[in-house]
Amino acid sequence: MKTLITLTLAILLCCSVANAQEHKQEPKQAETPQSKLVQFQMALLRRGPKWSPDPSRERAQMRQRHVAHLRSMLESNKLMIAGAISGDPELIEVHIFRTKSAEEATAWLNEDPAVSAGFIVPELHPWWSEDVMKKMSGPPGRFTTAYLAFLTRGDKWTPEKTPATEDIQKGHMANIQRLAEMKKLVVAGPFGDDGKLRGIFVFKVNSIDEARQLAATDPAVQSGRLALQIHPWTVPEGILP
């Protein structure tokens, strides 16, 4: 039930963020979900100028230092979750920091040996969700694969609110509730910077095909208002709800 409430509130906030510029005269729409959710910072880490796919001693040593740094950040609870992305030519990892401050998250990112050396380059976004992820407590080296879906503006996306978009939104939320009740969709939340990226879904399912099939049932996706990019996301066991 808590997960269901979390997902519902997250989508309510997603609506308020998307319409913030067009509906500033309606502050309650933004304030109510924000009072229930927590702001974090999400870093999308892409290949940097020093990145290379070729194996080398330098790359192996950098990888070890990078992983050690991530574990230290997870243990200190500064980093809520971090994992490797598969199937994208540029995006390598996604990290979520337990802070609403972009400056603080940037400072933590710059402490990462792989970032400071130019192997990876972070792209930071404010992100909202209820605080449902658990502090890492399992032994090192145990991972699980979830499926991370980025919701982006689709070809039919518009900022205007109309009866048609309201109907789509109602169907969108009903579908999220259905997926949450199935215990397939475990985390959802909107980005707060009103850009092309609108939010994320995290699926705990057996395959990317199943994640795609579930995501495709969303009326906002079917209508073209939202589009999806889904990737395997390898994260430490025991953190996702």
Feature annotation, model-predicted:
Residues 1-6, 21:
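Positively charged n-region of N-terminal signal peptides that target proteins for export
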Residues 6-16:
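Bacterial N-terminal signal peptides
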Residues 21-241:
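Conserved, structured core segments of small domains
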